[in-house]
């Protein structure tokens, strides 16, 4: 099997999922820390979007970033953010409202269905699958299939974009929130 590292979406596709306008407030949230705290930004963004969807009153994005950083990025003595770190931060915030974070190793199995239901999803990109982002967390809000059947995601990237397009084959896991 030959790993294809470069992927580019060079055709017009039909994006499905949440309205792009829902992501506009997040354009101002750029992760400038070194090392980055992308898991915290993704979890906070997902929380704001789900709070709006579910009618739950939670904290502001700024308050969430402050509060979640310690529980996601620094709770355990290693560098980097694994899915269980993001999951822990989300569960800490959402358990009081009767919600739980779910996880699937293969994002392409769950993301289209969740987005059809209006549920945004945190996905992890990985260097092992050729992602130019290396290991990074994004919030996916739209998906599309190209003419060859390849699945693509449109996402909030906390490096400053709300319209990042990535191929699903460069992601390894998905996290989302559901009512218990």
Where are these regions (language model features)?
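Conserved active-site-adjacent core of cysteine acyl-enzyme catalytic domains
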Residues: 65-180
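Active-site-adjacent structural segments surrounding the nucleophilic cysteine of cysteine proteases
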Residues: 1-79, 146-148
């Amino acid at each position: 099997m030959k790993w294809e590292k470069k992927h580019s979406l060079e055709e017009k596709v039909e994006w499905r999922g949440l309205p792009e306008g829902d992501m506009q407030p997040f354009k101002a949230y750029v992760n400038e820390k070194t090392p980055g705290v992308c898991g915290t930004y993704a979890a906070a963004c997902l929380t704001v979007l789900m709070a709006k969807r579910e009618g739950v009153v939670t904290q502001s994005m700024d308050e969430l970033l402050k509060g979640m950083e310690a529980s996601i990025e620094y709770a355990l003595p290693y560098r980097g953010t694994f899915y269980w770190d993001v999951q822990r931060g989300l569960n800490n915030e959402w358990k009081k409202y009767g919600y739980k974070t779910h996880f699937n190793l293969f994002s392409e199995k769950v993301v289209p269905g969740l987005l059809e239901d209006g549920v945004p999803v945190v996905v992890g990109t990985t260097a092992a699958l050729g992602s130019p982002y290396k290991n990074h967390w994004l919030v996916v809000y739209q998906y599309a299939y190209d003419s060859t059947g390849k699945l693509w995601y449109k996402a909030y990237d906390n490096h400053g974009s709300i319209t990042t397009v990535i191929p699903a084959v460069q992601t390894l896991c998905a996290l989302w929130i559901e009512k218990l």
